């Protein structure tokens, strides 16, 4: 019976030893992520041109892996560049923040998204009210 009681704490410590590296890797990931966020914010404020080539590098890297599109790089990037330039300020930040499990970033992101959703909702309600009142008065 002594061996069984000794085996239980060993497995318990093994569980803790397995969970600690995961938490360490998460904190390391969050720390590196927050540093990259700060650098990207600084870059977007001071050097907006430095961020645009980085956003163009990602699509070209994706095209080179596909093979077919890498043969004609001159024809495919222009329409994609137009799409990327419109979303370049928002899209690179969203997926990276969502993947990080830092509670501070998640709360900030949720607050920003809620504000945007509420603003869109208010605009939609206002439009529908003005349309419905316009139809009734005419």
UniProtKB/Swiss-Prot annotation:
Short motif (Nuclear localization signal): ranges: 111-119
Transcription regulation found in the keyword field: no
Tissue specificity annotation: Expressed by spermatids (at protein level).
Polar residues composition-biased segments: 1-33, 125-138
Coiled coil: none
Entry binding sites for Zn(2+): 12, 16, 26, 30
InterPro entries reported in the protein's UniProt record: TP2 (IPR000678)
Main localization category: nucleus
Modified residues (Phosphoserine): 133
Its biological purpose: Plays a key role in the replacement of histones to protamine in the elongating spermatids of mammals. In condensing spermatids, loaded onto the nucleosomes, where it promotes the recruitment and processing of protamines, which are responsible for histone eviction.
Family: Belongs to the nuclear transition protein 2 family.
Protein name as catalogued: Nuclear transition protein 2
Species: Homo sapiens
Lineage: Eukaryota, Metazoa, Chordata, Craniata, Vertebrata
Gene: TNP2
